[in-house]
Amino acid sequence: GFALGDGFACIDLDHCMDASHRLLPWAKMILAPVEGKTYVEVSPSGDGLHIWGTCAERKGVRTRDLMNAEAYSQGRYMTVTMKPYGNAVDRLADITLIYDVIERLATP
């Protein structure tokens, strides 16, 4: 696993795939800005994704109403599966935009 902080962040999309392992529409929208630009892996559940990247440290956020998404950049330990998803690359991109979207939709 990996302890987030020092500029490293992770977006955790839970239950974002259908039975055929195709992304649900909301997950496609979240992934689109960084697809092919940052490392993305299948989460331990097998039907979720971890989008790894860089972002300034900020409060963790979660939304459950419109989508099952969480965003963390500090004080959180994330499991690393090393199961790349799609055209995942071996580098990290800035995921601040995705973090911002999840924060705006966050469940209070």
Where are these regions (language model features)?
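Signature for HUH/AEP ssDNA processing cores
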Residues: 1-46, 56, 85, 107-108
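Helical (often loop-to-helix) elements that flank the catalytic cores of nucleotide-handling enzymes
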Residues: 20-34, 53-79, 86-95
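Long, charge-rich alpha-helical interaction segments
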Residues: 99-108
